[in-house]
Amino acid sequence: MSRRRRAEKRQVLPDPKFGDLIVTKFMNYVMYEGKKAVAENIIYGAFDILENKRKDQGPLETFHSALDNVAPAIEVRSRRVGGATYQVPVEVRPDRRRALAIRWLVTAARKRGENTMTEKLAGELLDASNNRGTAVKKREDTHKMAEANRAFSHYRW
């Protein structure tokens, strides 16, 4: 165990257009090589596409519903007990839930078949808000894994 003190969480500023901290976090996950302006254009472009495709809901509501649909409630963590390694199901902390949801959405969007990242991201957010798509499947697989290993839940720490 580390003897140093725990690292402080960095505070991020809300994004300029919507004033939302989670959009800024999402932007930072999309960003490559410190090019924040490029990431900003990708995200705001995707939000424009979402606004055109979903008239009933705003892009920010669609984004938040997509995040909620992808966020896992439970995951498995490896625990070594007497020479055997067990996959122990544990609840996911709220900050990790959001981080995993964002990471899975961005990864799923990057693997999609559309031409530009803006289109890929808009498509994945739209799918996730409708409870389908690769990112939602990832969450379902995580939950299935946890359910399959429920017998080892008494090894929780």
UniProtKB/Swiss-Prot annotation:
> What is an annotated GO biological process for this record, any one?
translation
Query: Quick one: signal sequence residues?
Result: none
Keywords noted in UniProt: Ribonucleoprotein, Ribosomal protein, RNA-binding, rRNA-binding, tRNA-binding
Can you tell me where the transmembrane regions are?
none
A single GO CC term for this protein reads:
small ribosomal subunit
Q: Which family is this sequence assigned to?
A: Belongs to the universal ribosomal protein uS7 family.
Q: Can you name this protein? A: Small ribosomal subunit protein uS7
Please give the organism. Caulobacter sp. (strain K31)
